Amino acid sequence: MKFFLDTANVEKIKEFNALGLVDGVTTNPSLIKKEGRDFYEVIKEICSIVKGPVSAEVIALDAEGMIKEAKELVKIAENVVIKIPMTKEGMKAVNILSKEGIKTNVTLIFSANQALLAAKAGATYVSPFVGRLDDIGQDGLLLISEIMQIFSAYGIETEVIVASVRHPIHVTESAKMGADVATIPFDVLDKLFNHSLTDIGIEKFLADWDAHLKR
C-alpha cells in the first residue's frame, strides 16, 4: 500500500518524507486555507519536496472551468494530479483530461457506483471517503471492499485512494482489502508508530543495559 499525506503543511511533509514514508500528497481548498499561503506557491513547494503524485483541486463547478484550471495547475510540476469532484460536469472534465494525458483524482466518492463511473470516465484515481460515511452511521470500510471487488472483477486500472482516514484501523483494514493508497492526515500517521508493548520493550532493554553497565 502506498501512503499519501493528506495535508498542505510543508513542514509536516518534510518531516515524514525524510522517513521515506511519503509516496504522494493530497490537498484540498480547506487544507490550503489553513496554511494561509498562496495556493500555487504551496503546491509548487510540495511538488519540489515530494516526487510522487500531488493532488491539487479545482474550484470551478463546470467542465470548461475545471479543464481551464487543470491546464494551469499541471504547469506547476509534472507530478501534479488534478482533483475533481464526482459530478456530471466533473466526469465530463475527467474524460477530456484523461484523453489529453492529464492525471485526475476524483474526490467525494461515497458509493461504489460513483467509483465505477469515475473509472469509466478515465480517472487515474478515485477517493472514497470512509470517515465521512462512518460519521453518518454507514460503514466506510464496506465501501472500500465493494470498490475493490468491482475493480478486481473487471481489471479496472484506476487506483483507489482511501480518503477521510480518521484512525489507524482505517489504514489497516483497507490495506487488508488491497486498496492501492491511503491518504493519511499527519496526526493519524503518527499514531501508526505507537504500541504500548513497543514502549515497554524499549524501557526494559534500557533498564537491562543500565544494570549491565553498573556491574
UniProtKB/Swiss-Prot annotation:
Keywords: Cytoplasm, Pentose shunt, Schiff base, Transferase. The active site is at residue 83. Gene3D superfamilies: Aldolase class I. Transmembrane segments: none annotated. It is an enzyme of class 2 (transferase). One of its GO terms (molecular function) is transaldolase activity. It is found in: Cytoplasm. Pathway: Carbohydrate degradation; pentose phosphate pathway; D-glyceraldehyde 3-phosphate and beta-D-fructose 6-phosphate from D-ribose 5-phosphate and D-xylulose 5-phosphate (non-oxidative stage): step 2/3. Belongs to the transaldolase family. Type 3B subfamily. This is Probable transaldolase.
